C-alpha cells in the first residue's frame, strides 16, 4: 500500500477484514507472510506500531472515567515517545464541552467521535479506521471525511472498512477486495469505475460480486 492513498478494505461478512486489521495492530500474529512499514517488520516492533492510529468499530473505555481524563491518560502514556499532537478533530467535534462527562453517559455517536479523535491524536503516519462513520450524525460524518482527505493529502496511508459504502465514495482512492482471507484484487477506484461502468462504490462492488468478469480481477500490489 502506498502513502498518500486511502484504501477501502471490502469483502463479504467473514472474509477476513477484521483479522487483517488485527494483524496490523499486533493483536493477531499471521500464520504466514510479513507485514512491513517503511521496510521494517511490524512483528514485535511496538515503536513502529506506535505510528499507526486506530479507530475501532466499537470503542471500549473505562465507564467511570471522564472524557477529559481519558485524553490526559493517553497523553501521559505517550509522553516522550510522540511529540506531535493533532487536535483538529477534538476542536471540530467540541470535545472540550464534554470533558467532564463520564464515558458511561455518552451516546454511541459521541463515543465514535471520541474514538476518531484518539485515532488522529498523535499524528500517526498510518490510520486504520474500522467502520468510522457508524453511529455518527451527518455533520460529524462530513467533518470526519474532510479530515481523512486532508490527512491523505499530507501523504498519510489510510485503511478504511465500512458496510456503508456510500460513505467511502468520496474518500477512497483504491479498493482492496478480499474473500475468505484471500486477496482478489487491489485496484485504483477510478480504474474500477471505468471498467465496471458504475460511479457509486456500492453499485460497483455489487456488480463485481454478481459478475466477476465485469472488471479485471488481476492482482496488483497493494
Q: Where are each of the predicted segments found?
A:
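Conserved ABC ATPase signature
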Residues: 102-109
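Conserved ABC transporter NBD signature motif
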Residues: 33-48
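Hydrophobic anchor residue at the start of the ABC signature
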Residues: 116
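Helix-to-loop junction immediately C-terminal to a conserved catalytic motif
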Residues: 25
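Catalytic Walker B motif of ABC-type/P-loop ATPase nucleotide-binding domains
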Residues: 127-131
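Conserved ABC ATPase "signature" region
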Residues: 72, 83-98
Amino acid at each position: 500500500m502506498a502513502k498518500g492513498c486511502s484504501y477501502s478494505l471490502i469483502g463479504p461478512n467473514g472474509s477476513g477484514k477484521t483479522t487483517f486489521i488485527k494483524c496490523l495492530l499486533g493483536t493477531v500474529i499471521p500464520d504466514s507472510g510479513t507485514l512491513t512499514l517503511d521496510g521494517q517488520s511490524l512483528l514485535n516492533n511496538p515503536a513502529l506500531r506506535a505510528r499507526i492510529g486506530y479507530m475501532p468499530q466499537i470503542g471500549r473505555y473505562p465507564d467511570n472515567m471522564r472524557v477529559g481524563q481519558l485524553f490526559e491518560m493517553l497523553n501521559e502514556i505517550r509522553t516522550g515517545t510522540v511529540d506531535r499532537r493533532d487536535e483538529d478533530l477534538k476542536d471540530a467535534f467540541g470535545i472540550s464541552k464534554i470533558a467532564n462527562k463520564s464515558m458511561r453517559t455518552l451516546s454511541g455517536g459521541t463515543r465514535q467521535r471520541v474514538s476518531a479523535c484518539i485515532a488522529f491524536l498523535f499524528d500517526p503516519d498510518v490510520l486504520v479506521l474500522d467502520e468510522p462513520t457508524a453511529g455518527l450524525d451527518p455533520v460529524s460524518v462530513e467533518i470526519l471525511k474532510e479530515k481523512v482527505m486532508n490527512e491523505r493529502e499530507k501523504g498519510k496511508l489510510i485503511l478504511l472498512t465500512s458496510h456503508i459504502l456510500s460513505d467511502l465514495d468520496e474518500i477512497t482512492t483504491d479498493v482492496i477486495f478480499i474473500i475468505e482471507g484471500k486477496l482478489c484484487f487491489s485496484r485504483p477506484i477510478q480504474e474500477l469505475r471505468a471498467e465496471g461502468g458504475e460511479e457509486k462504490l456500492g453499485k460497483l462492488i455489487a456488480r463485481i460480486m454478481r459478475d466477476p468478469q465485469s472488471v479485471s480481477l488481476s492482482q496488483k500490489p497493494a
